[in-house]
Amino acid sequence: IANIVKKVNKRIYFIIQLKRAHVSEADIINFYTTCVRPVMEFCCQVFHFALPSYLSNALERVQKRVLSIIYPLTAYADCLEKSGIKTLYDRRVDACEKLFNEIITTPAVNMDDHIPSRFFPNYDLRHSRTYIVPLTKTNRYKNSFFPSSARHINDNN
């Protein structure tokens, strides 16, 4: 994450230059979403569930800094609303859900050993789970993509 933040900080310099050149806020947001944010979101599905909160906050702090450059003297929540940008955490969750659903629904993917099996109860439950979450012996496997995604989908149903 430190290397990602370092790469992004180099690109933030260009945002400062665009702001000094009086480029419109919409164009700066467009530059941020096309050139800077993809660096922070690259392969985020792999590390999202294993990412400690302090590293997640470090990534979010970078986005907060960019938005404070574009919209000075404005609260972060207001900047997000003004620019139409979601928090990085929300985008990572959406990306993980999208990838998991793509893997589940694509029949050509041969990952039957890794994908948690679906749960079909014989009776109605108030909080039915969609997938059987595998038992894990280590935290590393517990926080990996498939068990965490299955747990996340079960919690949100």
Which role fits each region the language model picked out?
Residues I1-N157:
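Hydrophobic/basic alpha-helical segments
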